[in-house]
């Protein structure tokens, strides 16, 4: 009798659990440097492989998706529905973040007696000009966009080439076949890299737990908990409910289907690196391949719901540390600023911190206060990345259903 092979999602879950256990062992015996020297390098190799494959995956999957749609009108329809979905859920994420932050604050669960030590200053970016970002979206050198892994520019390149191939008609047939062939090759390479996920998850999780143990158990634990409660509630209320209401996928089926990508995103903290798994999960739950090929890469770049919750929680906490009590009007300003900032900083390295700095400036809170939570940013990042890609999958399912209904009505 042939022995049944353990599925990749199960392997990833076991690797995650084992990584936590081994990480705790190294933390409690006081040898976290072992994980830094001997575990993290293998995790870094895995992450490097993911970064290496991200640009060709985004480029070819989006071009292939556009070609598969066969009509730029459909591309436009899918595009505006995707952006609208993300804007609405980002605004909802801000509200959820503010609600739970205020609950924790009023219950006395936030350590508001913290203060900056001498020399603690924030020297990162504090603003991002939307018009500058808009100009930067359009590449002047295609190859530089690829080498810099500028995902917004890669998406624009994909849109232009995909549209160009469709516009060329029969003369573009060779280009269509070339894209399809290259994407098949990249898909195989991608499958091999993803098969290494358990190793990457185990080594990275071991390193994180062993080195971040004090912060997890320390005085910022409740601030971290508040953000994670917000992440979970948002995933249930916005993503699973919308997938159920609009795409007919039950919450249980949705989370079970999205689990491999969620776990992978949690440990890798990279939405872009999770694109292949996110697309696979969405397709298996009923998303059309051409729609998911377009929505997932776009969402990995512009969907920042997890970041929105994080910065709302962080703003309320840091304001309390300054002795400030924010009014309802100021909280509305946070929602508007955070939602617009998610567009203005899309695709920007360190976007989470830039967005938070923008919100703090809008509230007249000293930007240097960021340093109080900067040390555990990776722990926040794990949860917010997981939430972001969950939203990408939900969006792909919803847009697929909306487009199929539209097609059915047109056919009548």
Annotate each PLM feature:
Residues 54-58, 197-200, 270-278, 308-313, ...:
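Transmembrane helix boundary and interhelical junction motifs in multipass membrane proteins
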Residues 312-412:
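Transmembrane alpha-helical segments and their short flanking loops
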Residues 7, 46, 75, 146, ...:
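Residue-level signature of catalytic and energy-coupling elements of molecular machines
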Residues 45, 63, 82-87, 160, ...:
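Transmembrane helix-bundle signature of multi-pass membrane transporters/permeases
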Residues 67-74, 109, 168-173, 181, ...:
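Juxtamembrane helix-boundary/capping and inter-helix hinge elements in multi-pass membrane proteins
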Residues 2-3, 9-13, 20-35, 47-50, ...:
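Signature of multi-pass transmembrane helix bundles
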Residues 260-342, 396, 406-412:
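Helix-loop-helix junctions within the multi-pass membrane cores of secondary transporters/permeases
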Residues 31-38, 76, 214-222, 248-259, ...:
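Membrane-water interface of transmembrane alpha-helices in multipass transporters/channels
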């Amino acid at each position: 009798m042939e022995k049944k092979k353990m599925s990749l999602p199960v392997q990833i879950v076991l690797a995650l659990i084992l990584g936590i256990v081994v990480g705790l062992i190294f933390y409690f015996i006081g040898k976290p440097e072992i994980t830094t020297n001997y575990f993290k390098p293998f995790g870094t190799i895995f992450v490097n492989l993911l970064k290496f494959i991200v640009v060709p995956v985004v480029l070819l999957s989006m071009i292939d998706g556009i070609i598969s749609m066969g009509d730029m009108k459909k591309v436009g329809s899918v595009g505006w529905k995707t952006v609208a979905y993300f804007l609405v859920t980002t605004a909802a994420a801000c509200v959820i973040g503010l609600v739970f932050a205020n609950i924790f604050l009023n219950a006395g669960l936030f350590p508001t007696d913290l203060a900056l030590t001498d020399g603690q200053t924030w020297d990162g970016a504090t603003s991002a000009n939307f018009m500058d970002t808009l100009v930067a979206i359009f590449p002047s050198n295609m190859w530089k966009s690829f080498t810099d892994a500028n995902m917004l520019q890669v998406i624009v390149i994909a849109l232009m080439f995909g549209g160009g191939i469709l516009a060329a008609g029969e003369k573009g047939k060779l280009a269509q076949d070339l894209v399809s062939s290259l994407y098949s090759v990249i898909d195989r390479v991608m499958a091999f890299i993803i098969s290494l996920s358990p190793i990457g998850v185990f080594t990275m999780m071991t390193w994180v737990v062993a080195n971040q143990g004090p912060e997890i158990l320390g005085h910022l634990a409740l601030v971290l908990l508040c953000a994670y409660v917000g992440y979970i509630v948002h995933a249930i209320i916005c993503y699973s409910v919308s997938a159920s209401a609009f795409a007919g996928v039950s919450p249980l089926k949705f989370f079970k289907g999205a689990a491999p990508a969620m776990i992978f995103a949690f440990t890798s903290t990279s939405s872009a690196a999770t694109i292949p798994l996110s697309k696979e999960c969405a397709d298996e739950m009923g998303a059309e391949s051409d729609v998911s090929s377009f929505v997932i890469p776009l969402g990995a770049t512009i969907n920042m719901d997890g970041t929105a919750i994080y910065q709302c929680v962080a703003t309320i906490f840091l304001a309390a540390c300054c002795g400030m009590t924010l009014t309802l009007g100021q909280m509305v300003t946070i929602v508007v600023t955070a939602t617009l900032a998610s567009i203005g900083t899309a695709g920007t390295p360190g976007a989470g911190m830039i967005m938070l700095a923008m919100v703090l400036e809008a509230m007249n809170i000293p930007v240097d206060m960021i340093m109080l939570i900067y040390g555990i940013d990776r722990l926040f990042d794990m949860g917010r990345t997981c939430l972001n890609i969950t939203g990408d999958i939900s969006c792909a399912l919803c847009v697929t259903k909306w487009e199929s209904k539209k097609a059915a009505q047109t056919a009548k």
